[in-house]
Swiss-Prot record:
It comes from Shewanella baltica (strain OS185). Key enzyme in the regulation of glycerol uptake and metabolism. Catalyzes the phosphorylation of glycerol to yield sn-glycerol 3-phosphate. Gene3D superfamilies: 3.30.420.40. It holds the Pfam family FGGY_C. The lineage of its organism: Bacteria, Pseudomonadati, Pseudomonadota, Gammaproteobacteria, Alteromonadales. PROSITE patterns: FGGY_KINASES_1, FGGY_KINASES_2. One of its GO terms (molecular function) is glycerol kinase activity. Glycerol binds at residues 83-84, 135, 244-245. GO terms for biological process: glycerol catabolic process; glycerol metabolic process; glycerol-3-phosphate metabolic process. It catalyses: glycerol + ATP = sn-glycerol 3-phosphate + ADP + H(+). This is Glycerol kinase. Belongs to the FGGY kinase family. Sn-glycerol 3-phosphate binds at residues 13, 83-84, 135, 244. CDD domains: FGGY_EcGK_like.
Length: 494
């Protein structure tokens, strides 16, 4: 039977999804299932790994059945996933010894402080590209080994396996035959040397993690094994894998140095490809691994904003200023400007490039003439200002001035926000026709690995742009508006 499709498994923080793409990179079928969020203690976040697998395997069956697609027609399955989330399971039984500790979980803060006391902060920064933070997998692994009865003894005997979610899914898909990850996910563990592209023995020793626990690291664009859908039909190749933000970067075909994408979700994730050069940031950004045009290792600068779409949720849920997120475009467009109002949405502190956990949200410039429309417009503009903060930091670190910014995520449907983003950054903003770029990136990697597509050049003909947003304000206005934002941020941090 002719191979007509590639399936992307998109395992996210709140739901598991499966998306079928045809040879023209069109979406044919989508299936999605949410799963349980567990909060056993303040600041702790967990998932049940078996529920993740159940939700992901069921949507894989559903997505094909819904479109009447036979498994024989599927060329490959690609994987993209929430990064950093940590699973440890028994090699013999495949049974997790503890719930998955989610990237948001802060329980290993004390372990991070111990590593800082040992003087490892600079070593971590230099060799992994990351900050010493509980966000990343390394300290989560140590917490499980230290706190689950008998776990450390089992690990020392080589009876346990660790994986981020990509590794866990491949293990389950291949029925325990393959224990593997890719460089983009390995680079988020805080255990991976991004220069030698190997596990870092000094960090493993510092955290007392046996090497036998860790998966083999294979290229993001390669075949890892085979699977059968629900144990039936012919074998399908499991091929192509990347963490969610790197998958989106590849899905946007940002495969050359200086190309960048911004994902507008709950927060914002801005990544810039820096090619074969790992650029160290002096402005609060992370240095991480990306995927090059032939599936090889490239590097990227990454910055994250905590409050993107979440700011709009606040307008809706806490202030009651809007009924739906899409209302913001209408209200923001009813006024010519914010009337001097700035919202700094530092509800949980400020992310890159400030990294100020003590900052708190504030509205500035309120006068008797300020109304609902001005506040809504200021909220939308705050997302663009924060993204400009990241973009300026990337320009300083990389020495590359961006000319075009590719965008994806839920908020890109808002034309007002996209136009203001172009205006305030003086950069052309490109919105793709297919905004499912994370899943598309996984599909591209899988399809390239098995020859479903020949090259990135072929893919460029399939990646259509829905709309170009051209900068439309003068330099003087841009400087004045951004100076107002910088002043508001400074006051928030005072």
């Amino acid at each position: 039977m002719q191979k007509k499709y590639v399936v992307a498994l998109d395992q996210g923080t709140t739901s598991s999804r499966a998306i079928v793409f045809d040879h023209d990179a069109n979406i044919v079928s989508v299936s999605q299932r949410e799963f349980t969020q567990l909060y056993p203690n303040p600041g702790w976040v967990e998932h049940d790994p078996m529920e993740i697998w159940a939700s992901q395997s069921s949507v894989l069956v559903e997505v094909l059945a819904r479109a009447g697609i036979h498994s024989d027609e599927v060329a490959a399955i690609g994987i993209t996933n929430q990064r950093e989330t940590t699973v440890i399971w028994e090699k013999a039984t495949g049974k997790p010894i503890y719930n998955a500790i989610v990237w948001q979980c802060r329980r290993s803060s004390e372990i991070c402080e111990q590593l800082k006391a040992q003087g490892l902060e600079e070593y971590v920064r230099e060799n992994t590209g990351l900050l010493l933070d509980p966000y990343f997998s390394g300290t989560k692994i140590k917490w499980i080994l230290d706190n689950v009865p008998n776990a450390r003894a089992q690990a020392e005997r080589g009876e346990l396996l660790f994986g981020t979610i990509d590794t866990w899914l491949v293990w389950k898909l291949t029925e325990g035959k393959v224990h593997v990850t890719d460089p983009t996910n390995a680079a988020r563990t805080m255990l991976f040397n991004i220069h030698s592209l190997t596990w870092d023995n000094k960090l493993l020793e510092a955290l007392d993690i046996p090497l036998s626990l860790l998966p083999e690291v294979k290229p993001s664009c390669s075949v890892y094994g085979t699977t059968r859908i629900a144990g039936e039909g012919s074998e399908i190749q499991v091929a192509g894998m990347a963490g969610d933000q790197q998958a989106a970067l590849f899905g946007q075909l940002c495969v050359e140095p200086g190309m960048a994408k911004n994902t507008y979700g709950t927060g914002c994730f801005l990544l810039m490809n820096t090619g074969t050069k790992a650029v160290r940031s002096n402005h609060g950004l992370l240095t991480t691994v990306a995927v090059g045009p032939k599936g090889e290792v490239n590097y990227a600068l990454e910055g994250s904003v905590f409050m993107g779409g979440a700011t709009i949720q606040w307008l809706r849920d806490e202030l009651g200023l809007i009924r739906d997120a899409s209302d913001t475009e209408y209200f923001a467009s009813k006024v010519a400007d914010t009337n001097g109002v700035y919202l700094v949405p530092a509800f949980v502190g400020l992310g890159a490039p400030y990294w100020d956990p003590n900052a708190r949200g504030a509205l500035f410039g309120l006068t008797r003439g300020a109304n609902r429309n001005h506040i809504i417009r200021a909220a939308l503009e705050s997302i663009a200002y924060q993204s400009k903060d990241l973009l300026d930091a990337m320009t300083k670190d990389s020495g590359v001035s961006l000319k075009r910014l590719k965008v994806d995520g839920g908020a890109v449907a808002n034309d007002f926000l996209m136009q203001f983003q172009a205006d305030i950054t003086d950069v052309e903003v490109l919105r793709p026709s297919v905004c499912e770029t994370t899943a598309l990136g996984a599909a591209f990697l899988a399809g390239l690995a098995v020859g479903f597509w020949e090259s990135v050049i072929e893919l460029e003909h399939k990646a259509c742009i829905d709309k170009h947003f051209i900068p439309n304000i003068d330099a003087e206005t841009r400087v004045r508006l951004y100076a107002g934002w910088q002043d508001a941020v400074a006051r928030t941090r005072a």
